[in-house]
């Protein structure tokens, strides 16, 4: 019918990095692109969200939009969805977890998301990592090493890579890396908070 609004959609998947989210947005011709050729710092400035790093903050889901909707509007919607899910789960978290704040839980959830895609393993892996944090043991998880390698990662991790200190190498650092390494889904958020 005339007057019906045609809806388009863009999907962000669990485990994606912010770069992958932006790549998905860039491929949608019906989106008004305000962020495409900007640095992450400039994108954050334009988004005007209360975050200092974009990684992990945009909830994985399918977002429907009409032609001319901006990438800023879609990312704001995805941020609000992550914030809502994180707030709800944080408010009902288990006692005695080693996180100082919900951002640390988001970081841990991103690690769980990259560590396994199997539903039944999330709780077990989260339990192992929580115990390691509680006793001050390094997390020792390959996905953080891979993230820290950036474009240098070519499909394999060497022993040297595991020893090379980066702020994301959980073989060489104590505790959590400084930011999430991907966008976690609700199941990973739940696993690290229960």
List each model region and its residues.
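Bacterial extracytoplasmic/cell-wall-associated proteins, especially those involved in peptidoglycan
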Residues: 29-31, 44-194
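Short, well-structured active-site flanking segments
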Residues: 32-40
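Glycine-rich loop/hinge motif
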Residues: 2-30, 95-102
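Short, flexible domain-boundary/linker segments around small modular repeats
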Residues: 1-4, 42-45
């Amino acid at each position: 019918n005339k007057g019906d609004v045609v809806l388009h959609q863009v999907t962000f998947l669990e485990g994606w990095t912010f770069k992958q989210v932006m790549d998905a947005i860039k491929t949608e011709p019906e989106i008004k692109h305000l962020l495409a050729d900007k640095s992450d710092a400039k994108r954050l400035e334009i988004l005007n969200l209360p975050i200092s790093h974009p990684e992990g903050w945009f909830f994985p889901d399918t977002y429907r939009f009409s032609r001319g909707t901006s990438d800023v509007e879609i990312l704001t919607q995805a941020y609000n969805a992550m914030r809502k899910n994180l707030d709800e789960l944080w408010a009902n978290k288990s006692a005695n977890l080693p996180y100082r704040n919900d951002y640390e839980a988001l970081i841990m959830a991103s690690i769980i998301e990259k560590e396994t895609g199997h539903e039944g393993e999330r709780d077990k892996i989260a339990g192992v990592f929580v115990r390691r944090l509680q006793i001050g043991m390094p997390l020792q998880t390959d996905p953080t090493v891979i993230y820290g390698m950036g474009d240098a990662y070519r499909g394999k991790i060497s022993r040297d890579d595991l020893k090379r200190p980066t702020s994301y190498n959980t073989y060489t650092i104590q505790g959590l890396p400084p930011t999430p390494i991907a966008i976690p889904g609700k199941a990973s958020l739940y696993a690290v908070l229960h």
